Design a protein with these regions (language model features):
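Active-site histidine-anchored catalytic micro-motif
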Residues: 1-3, 12
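A general secondary-structure signal for short beta-strands and their flanking turns/coil
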Residues: 3-5, 87
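C-terminal accessory/tail domains of diverse enzymes
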Residues: 13-164
Length: 164
């Protein structure tokens, strides 16, 4: 587990009925990873070297579709954070392997939450969504994800009040 990755595959059919719908959702998933890279990198438990070698970034752009188009022309092959080279699945490769059940479940719950966002929000809404907004929308039943985010100090949805 010190060197293996935890790769999560998402069926393209779960992301939309048509190829065009699937491509739009995939572009928003990629956009989410680029927009919230610092938080997701911390969540991943990987080193910078490991990410660069096995799960490299595609690069930020404020237009999700442009990230996807750049990725399609990339020479990274499957060694990208969001791997789109598989015919029937999108593969998320960012996460370090684990034998801990709670870390495993937190990772699955995170990927599901990201995918749900990408399906339900349009490009403009994704562009405006902060990490705190994302965390606020996590399903309360995703207890492992919420606990893991708190452990990593990534759970930032509680408002801060100013004291006089």
């Amino acid at each position: 587990t010190s060197t293996c990755g935890l790769h999560v595959h998402i069926g393209r059919k779960q992301l939309g009925y048509s190829y065009e719908e699937q491509e739009e959702v995939i572009s928003r998933i990629m956009f989410f990873f680029e927009s919230h890279w610092n938080e997701l990198f911390k969540f991943s438990r990987r080193t910078a070297y490991s990410v660069d070698r096995w799960a490299a970034r595609h690069g930020y752009n404020d237009k999700p579709k442009e990230i996807l188009e750049k990725a399609k022309k990339s020479t990274k092959g499957r060694y990208a954070c969001v791997n789109i080279t598989n015919a029937d699945t999108v593969e998320i490769r960012l996460f370090r392997g684990t034998l801990k059940f709670n870390s495993f479940m937190a990772t699955l719950e995170l990927v599901d939450s990201i995918c749900e966002n990408a399906v339900c929000l349009n490009d403009d809404e994704m562009n405006k969504q902060s990490w705190a907004d994302f965390v606020l929308g996590i399903k309360p039943e995703y207890t492992e994800l919420i606990r893991y985010l708190k452990e990593k100090r990534l759970y930032v949805n509680e408002p801060v009040s100013e004291e006089d």
